[in-house]
A protein has these predicted regions:
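Short loop->beta transition adjacent to catalytic acidic/histidine clusters or analogous donor-positioning motifs
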Residues: 2-4, 29-40, 60-63
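Conserved nucleotide-sugar donor-binding catalytic segment
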Residues: 6, 140-222
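Short, well-formed alpha-helical segments that are part of the catalytic scaffolds
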Residues: 13-30
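Short aromatic/hydrophobic "clamp" motif used to bind/position activated sugar donors
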Residues: 90
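Conserved donor NDP-sugar-binding/catalytic core segment of glycosyltransferases
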Residues: 98, 103-134
Length: 234
């Protein structure tokens, strides 16, 4: 069972994108499961991140694709990555996050082989920018049965899905895009497969989107959009 690990990349301030991508790919080198490739969708204007991918291509199966859509949001970049994925399982893992379980991909493959579920979430922990402090470990659960954009699951780095069940992220959303994506997975495919153990780490850093007030200010507007969207569907 082949897994495509999809990573949307973009320019961050103070060179963080280059540092994070190097660490990201280095972590994947040590995964015990080897039947996987990495799909990198790059929104950045220069070739700095491409050069990093070219270097790691000597030891990892990397498919690098430039995203020239001009739409600078996470959902568009995720969708661009997943469109180029060929694995049986699509695994999302953001550039600033990383695996802390070297058997993580193996456990994802085994979970899909043993269960009929269409999508999956796993346990996660948080860390600071320099990975010197780890905190707020969480056991995954999916508790949002309502189309309001609430997110009880973490970010999409916990998420994997069978390729034939892949859905696109809503590119109209910035702040509650994750919660709506999880809800739509539930809406179409029911409850997720759950791996309770911690597999991935969410890194909090100076350029984290969830810290930016301009995104937080979108909450009321986006919740209304989501509620109206599902009124038309239900």
């Amino acid at each position: 069972m082949k897994i495509s690990v999809c990573v949307p990349v973009y320019e961050m301030k103070n060179g963080l994108s280059k540092r994070f991508l190097i660490e990201y790919l280095a972590h994947l080198m040590y995964q015990s499961y080897t039947d996987f490739d990495i799909v990198v969708s790059d929104q950045s204007e220069n070739d700095d991140l491409k050069k990093i991918c070219d270097t790691f291509s000597n030891v990892l199966d990397i498919k690098y694709v430039k995203n020239t859509s001009g739409i600078k949001n996470a959902a568009n970049n995720v969708n661009h990555a997943t469109k180029h994925a060929t694995g049986d399982i699509i695994k999302l893992l953001y550039m600033d996050d990383f695996y802390v379980d070297r058997d993580g991909l193996k456990k994802v493959a085994e979970a899909f082989e043993k269960n009929d579920g269409k999508w999956l979430i796993c346990g996660f922990v948080h860390c600071n920018q320099d990975k010197t402090k780890f905190f707020d470990q969480r056991t995954p659960w999916y508790g949002n049965k309502y189309p309001n954009g609430d997110n009880t699951t973490g970010n999409p780095s916990t998420y994997a899905v069978r390729k034939e069940c892949l859905i696109e992220m809503d590119e109209n959303l910035l702040w509650i895009v994750d919660g709506e994506y999880f809800y739509r997975s539930y809406y179409h495919y029911g409850d997720p497969i759950i791996i309770p153990e911690v597999q991935v780490c969410f890194r909090e850093h100076e350029d984290s989107a969830f810290l930016k007030q301009e995104f937080r200010d979108l909450e009321v507007k986006e919740r209304k959009y989501v509620e109206e969207k599902y009124k038309a569907m239900l």
